[in-house]
Amino acid sequence: YWPEYSCNGKEDTKVSDLLCHRAAMFGFKEGIPLGSFQDWNKFIQQLQLQTPYRKPGISQGYHALTFGWLVGELIRRVDGRSVGQYFKEEIAEPLNIDFHIGLDEIDLIRCADMLMIERDSMQLPGQFLRYVPSFLLPQRLKNFKTALLSGDFLEAFQEREEEDANYVNSLDWRKAEIPSANGHGTAKSLARLYGILSNGCARDEISIMSEASLQYAITPHSSGPDSVLFGAPIKFGLGYELAQGISTVGNISPTLNNKMFGHAG
């Protein structure tokens, strides 16, 4: 699908690796490209030439920002349309879902501003674990320490230097198509979308996908530990985050199967 991506150690990357956060491309090694967020090709060119952080397919690391460009470019290569255009024409408009990947001028006035946390106020949890010998830690905390020392979190959630933390309120950001970070919509529209997916994947004779495709997509394809999210045993299907099993009475009752899917963020 994407011949230019097949270089510099990424030659054996599978589509499933991109969809379940195992492509080892969770950050921009040279920093997030400067200039307009609407310049899709600038971000794609940097990613397709980059070497992965480690061998693709071996470990899980949440692709917080890069996921949207990587999977979005696959969609563009296969279909010819951008991910925002595809979503609008194939899903949002036919099913009356007020959700957008890249806002049109007419919708800007409806958009609420966001108040972002300054990076200096974001203290990484568990810094003290750096100084605790690993053999003294239970496995979950060992995974946490390994992820903390790797620095993967800072790579995946990096920001452009000297950028105002409230850049997400800029016209450039709102008009850009950044599928992993700047979808704009209403709570009702998200409820409608997931209501359709959880009830046969179709409404008014319009189908988003087959039920078989959805069941395949929400089958666990990766389950951590996640090197970006501090070693957490997060499960991913193909594009969806999957819920963990739940216990009704603390840890003493049997674990129940939890079929929720979507994203916790």
Residue ranges and their predicted role:
Residues 3, 10-13, 20-112, 167, ...:
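Catalytic-site signature segments of enzymes, centered on catalytic residues
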Residues 5-10, 229-231:
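Acidic pyrophosphate-coordinating catalytic loop
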Residues 186-189, 195:
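Glycine-rich, aromatic-lined ligand/substrate-binding cores of catalytic
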Residues 76, 194-205:
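Non-catalytic, well-ordered alpha-helical segments in soluble enzyme domains
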Residues 118-187, 216-265:
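Active-site Gly/Thr loop motif
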Residues 202-215, 229-231:
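Short acidic alpha-helical/loop segments enriched in Asp/Glu that coordinate divalent cations
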Residues 21-22, 50, 196-200, 220:
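Generic structural signal for alpha-helix termini and adjacent loop/cap motifs
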Residues 18, 46-47, 217, 240:
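A generic structural signal for nonpolar/aromatic side chains embedded in well-ordered alpha-helices
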